[in-house]
């Protein structure tokens, strides 16, 4: 199920796709375009709602205090967290939320969408969840992304494209150098899976697929 289908089918989940509202409820320092930041620093700038996924059009920017015109309309700024980027899949069963699996992603602040790899974690981190997590029950499936244990977004479906029994994936992007293709293609145990994703045309550098093992 895609995020737009969750939006259509689970009205109670719609509020949680509003990342500005989510960040405010979680107590983060954040605000919409037109609201100046409280201090000069680097902030994450993202669309308030993005149902296309992939972190498309999100970026890190240094914004000066009291400047209120550096963020595009429809976007918001939020304090930036550093630490492990972890994605956890959960399922609701009989009113209880159960974690199923977790993966850690590796990217850089220069290109937030572009992950160099994802690795399955042998143990699922026990991160704190808000009391209002029960609002997600209608979706049955839940994916939460964390940075340093702090929630950055929620999805009413399971995340990641890990094939069964895979422990690591390496995304291949349109601009991935040929030498990297050759390396993984010729290295034992790595298998290529075509899996095109351009976030509904918003990524100029789409993902073509990934190697996994």
Protein language model features and the residues they cover:
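ATP-dependent carboxylate activation and anion-phosphoryl transfer catalytic cores
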Residues: 54, 97, 106-110, 118-213
């Amino acid at each position: 199920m895609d995020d737009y289908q969750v939006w259509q089918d689970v009205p109670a989940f719609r509020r949680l796709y509003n990342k500005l509202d989510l960040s405010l409820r979680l107590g983060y320092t954040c605000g919409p375009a037109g609201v100046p930041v409280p201090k000069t620093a680097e902030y994450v700038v993202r669309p308030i709602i993005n149902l296309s996924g992939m972190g498309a059009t999100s970026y890190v920017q240094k914004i000066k205090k009291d400047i209120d015109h550096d963020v595009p309309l429809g976007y918001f700024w939020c304090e930036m967290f550093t630490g492990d980027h972890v994605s956890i899949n959960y399922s609701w069963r009989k009113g209880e939320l159960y974690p199923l699996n977790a993966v850690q992603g590796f990217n850089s602040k220069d290109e937030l969408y572009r992950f160099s790899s994802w690795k399955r974690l042998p143990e699922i981190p026990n991160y704190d969840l808000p009391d209002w997590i029960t609002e997600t029950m209608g979706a049955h499936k839940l994916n939460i992304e964390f940075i340093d244990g702090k929630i950055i977004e929620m999805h009413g479906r399971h995340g990641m494209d890990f094939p069964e029994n895979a422990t690591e994936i390496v995304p291949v992007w349109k601009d991935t150098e040929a030498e990297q293709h050759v390396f993984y293609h010729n290295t034992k145990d790595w298998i290529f899976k075509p899996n095109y994703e351009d976030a509904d045309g918003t990524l100029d550098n789409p993902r073509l697929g990934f190697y996994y093992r």
